[in-house]
Amino acid sequence: MHVSHLQLADYRSYEAAYLELEPGVSTFIGPNGQGKTNLVEAIGYVATHSSHRVAHDAPLVRRGAQRAVIRAAVVRHGQTALIELEINPGRANRARLNRSPNTRMRDVLGILHTVLFAPEDLALVKGDPGERRRFLDELLTARAPRYAGVRSDYERVLKQRNALLKSAAAQNLHHRGGRDLPTLDVWDEHLAQIGAELLAARLALVAELQPLAAKAYGELTATQDPISLRYRCSATDEELDTTNRPQLVEILRAALLRARPDELRRGVSLVGPHRDDLQLWLNDLPAKGYASQGESWSYALALRLAGFELLRADGDDPVLLLDDVFAELDAERRRRLASYVRTAEQVLVTAAVPDDVPQELSGARFRVTGGSVERER
Ligand SMILES: Nc1ncnc2c1ncn2[C@@H]1O[C@H](COP(=O)(O)OP(=O)(O)OP(=O)(O)O)[C@@H](O)[C@H]1O
């Protein structure tokens, strides 16, 4: 798939921007702070309905404006879908598909697939478990949009359950072991059921990612260093060896029972997919805390490339967004990454310095300065 047009109104530093894009490689060059990342962020937003840089939408709207609009034409298998997103911080965002006003946000999720590589990816390896959970969940949702619903159902259950636990903690109910809290039993069951669905999907995804990430890491670094992805579930100390949902429901139910006194004391949910982690191992050591800067960065790239391979195997190349990644790599790794990604249907690259972009990625070139984007001829 590829994006053939992008139009922005009041998005970040852009009052108005319009670009025509082609399949193949396009490079966006310009000095720091001119709006290169804002462009790829906007395309990523169309795919995931979130930004890789901020957790909330407010910074996406141009200072002084009320709302931002992103319009993107996405060409898939010869058909064009016109997606329009209106970002209204503090209020519901709105979507239109092919100009139809009767579109829900979730109707346009999963039309455009992107894989974004950015300096922030280092947090995949070095950051909190939430970064890795988000990586898995975004990939799940790209492959099967219904997981957006599963994730938001899970978030809702968690919020309700936490509110209940918080008020129980305030009333010191843990002294009675929570026996007279039938509503908590109901929320436990919801959490176990929906949590198991998410857990099963994540475990299956990790199993698929493992060989692809190992291959990508080997190719990027030209080493045989073994990497392994291990899903750590908060419900058990052992490594889970099943993706069977009824079994996972049982495991979560039992863990919730065990955790209840602690949860009532602390007033938060301590068990479930929101507390899990994807541990990344390199050479039989956890990458977090042991891997070098260069190894961590290659690991993060390998995870993104594995995601790319999975989406590609599902039948359509995602659009690759490479935001300022070459500056972080030595010449050899730049070349290796470039030859890996240049086979994708569309690759959009940003760089402050043209020389950072390997020759393998020559293509259309755009100059970005002060909120305007011009194609170089
Ligand atoms: N909501 C906003 N309203 C107005 N301007 C904004 C908004 N958000 C970001 N900006 C501006 O956008 C610019 C940053 O754009 P961007 O991150 O795309 O830069 P870049 O060209 O990728 O730079 P670098 O090469 O340093 O990564 C900054 O000048 C910032 O002040």
From Swiss-Prot:
Any one Pfam family here would be: SMC_N
Subcellular locations according to the entry: Cytoplasm
Q: What's an example GO BP annotation here?
A: DNA synthesis involved in DNA repair
What's one GO-annotated cellular component?
cytoplasm
Molecular function GO terms recorded: ATP binding; single-stranded DNA binding
From which residue to which does the signal peptide run? none
For binding ATP, which residues are annotated in this chain's numbering?
A: 30-37
Has keyword Transport? no
Sorted alphabetically, the keyword list is: ATP-binding, Cytoplasm, DNA damage, DNA repair, DNA replication, DNA-binding, Nucleotide-binding, SOS response
What family is reported?
Belongs to the RecF family.
Q: What is the stated purpose of this protein?
A: The RecF protein is involved in DNA metabolism; it is required for DNA replication and normal SOS inducibility. RecF binds preferentially to single-stranded, linear DNA. It also seems to bind ATP.
What is the designated name of this protein?
Answer: DNA replication and repair protein RecF
